[in-house]
Curated annotation (Swiss-Prot):
Its EC number is 6.1.1.22. Gene3D superfamilies: Bira Bifunctional Protein, Domain 2, Nucleic acid-binding proteins. Pfam families: tRNA-synt_2 (PF00152), tRNA_anti-codon (PF01336). It comes from the Bacteria. The keyword Cytoplasm applies. It catalyses: tRNA(Asn) + L-asparagine + ATP = L-asparaginyl-tRNA(Asn) + AMP + diphosphate + H(+). Belongs to the class-II aminoacyl-tRNA synthetase family. This is Asparagine--tRNA ligase. GO terms for cellular component: cytoplasm. Disulfide bonds: none annotated.
């Protein structure tokens, strides 16, 4: 007897007439008047459950099988046969059923076999992966992460693990979570009455990282092509469908590369992972198209087959000002593009992914390379139809004097960035990179409108349950 995942049986990788055991949970049980029960058994290995046909001659049919409800865990042994019913090619003619775990009170089981609102599912995040929606999201999240790793590996990049605890504010925005072991009821103070962080665990102020970029740059200046992929944190009090306090970021860094190199990498990477999603998760994508967003599959296919439009920020502003459409947020040179501006450019004007380059320096971070005009920096955003910004990046400032000037302009203490400045002192090179918010990528591929529903246990303002 062999044990097989449901996906192997449904996809014909287990021979017809062979005996096999599957382990999983009951999605539904249906009883016929002829004394036969049909169990839909799922194990999470694919979207569809496996139908197990159970005759009433099994010794535990009356006492156990007829009491199985949604969520019960079972081990089903039987013979693989061609299915006569619609919806699956194969089913299991059960010869033995072992009940592993019952649902204590089926009437109060939070995941009863009915549709639940997405808001309700967030309240039971420990059980929501049992639903069709969140299970499909979890598999897609895995597929996209694996595709990203595969893409970078195949293209000669090294994965670098950057620290989650840091002293550097990469974005210079100050929206950071503090890490401390000090007694909040008895804080040590300096002579000036300020908190004495010298007595803290790290002997200084420390925070959860907002980006692995600065550390990634250090390794790019030794290994040439690297990427970081891990959790990042923003203490931003935003209750929107696009923001999380804890989320995952993918950040490649390329030495000897300019802004155009970063744009090319972004295009190749996105098309690679979207192809992987279509090839590897067809069943889940079909569900998303039927239940979440009817355009998910066609949107991905169109994205893959589109050439990215390339435009300067200044030209983008001119397009928005002259398009004749009214926006909630005003459009003028120097403003950061809002989501409605981004989506107009990608969905209406170009009807394709857009790379917007060379933004005003005053709305971008200190590390972005100053352009010759003295007003803009070599920054880029990739705008995708259906979501707006999906990637943000730049060519990094490799000139020490220009970096110091930007730090001073933004009121940042250059001594706090001493090691980052060292990279410019010892064999500096032009280098570029970008950041991809992983949850936004998952949301884009699945059509799920809120990023809280594409991460297992969302962390948002006033919510850190589970």
């Amino acid at each position: 007897m062999s044990v097989a995942p449901v996906v192997d049986v449904l996809q014909g990788r287990v021979a017809v007439d062979s005996e096999v055991t599957v382990r999983g949970w009951i999605r539904t049980r249906r009883d016929s008047k002829a004394g036969i029960s049909f169990l839909a058994v799922y194990d999470g290995s694919c979207f569809n459950p496996l139908q197990a046909v159970v005759n009433n001659n099994l010794p535990n049919y009356q006492d156990e099988v007829l009491h199985l409800t949604t969520g019960c865990s079972v081990e089903v042994t039987g013979t693989v046969v061609a299915s006569l019913g619609q919806g699956q090619n194969f089913e299991l003619q059960a010869t033995k059923i072992v009940v592993i775990g019952l649902v204590e009170d089926p009437d109060t089981y939070p995941m009863a076999a009915k549709r639940h609102s997405i808001e309700y599912l967030r309240e039971v995040a420990h059980l929501r992966p049992r639903t069709n929606l969140i299970g499909a999201v979890a598999r897609m999240r895995h597929t996209l992460a694996q595709a990203l790793h595969r893409f970078f590996h195949e293209n000669g990049y090294f994965w670098v693990s950057t620290p989650l605890i840091t002293a550097a504010d990469t974005e210079g925005a100050g929206e950071m979570f503090r890490v401390s072991t000090l007694d909040l009821q008895n804080l040590p103070l300096t002579d000036k009455g300020e908190v004495d962080f010298n007595q803290d665990f790290f002997g200084r102020e420390a925070f959860l990282t907002v980006s692995g970029q600065l550390n990634g740059e250090a390794y790019a200046c030794a290994l040439s092509k690297v990427y970081t992929f891990g959790p990042t944190f923003r203490a931003e009090n935003s209750n929107t469908s696009r923001h999380l306090a804890e989320f995952w970021m993918l950040e490649p860094e390329i030495a000897f590369a300019n802004l155009n190199d970063a744009a090319t990498l972004a295009e190749n990477m996105l098309k690679y992972v979207f192809k992987a999603a279509l090839a590897e998760r067809a069943d889940d994508l079909q569900f998303f198209a039927e239940r979440v967003d009817k355009d998910v599959i066609t949107r991905l296919e169109k994205f893959i087959n589109s050439d990215f439009a390339q435009i300067d920020y200044t030209s983008a502003i001119e397009i928005l000002q002259n398009c004749g459409q009214k926006f909630e947020n005003p459009v003028f040179w120097g403003v950061d593009l809002s989501s409605e501006h981004e989506r107009y450019l990608a969905e209406k004007h170009f009807q394709a992914p857009v790379v917007v380059k060379n933004y005003p320096k005053d709305i971008k971070a200190f590390y972005m390379r100053m352009n010759d005009d003295g007003k803009t920096v070599a920054a880029l955003d990739v705008l995708a139809p259906g979501i707006g910004e999906i990637i943000g990046g730049s060519q990094r400032e490799e000139r020490l004097d220009m970096l110091d000037k930007r730090l001073e302009e933004m009121g940042l203490n250059k001594e706090d960035y001493w090691w980052y400045r060292d990279l410019r002192r010892y064999g500096t090179v032009p280098h570029s990179g970008f950041g991809l918010g992983f949850e936004r990528l998952v949301a884009y591929v699945t059509g799920v409108p809120n990023v809280r529903d594409v991460i297992p246990f969302p962390r948002t303002p006033r919510s850190a349950n589970f």
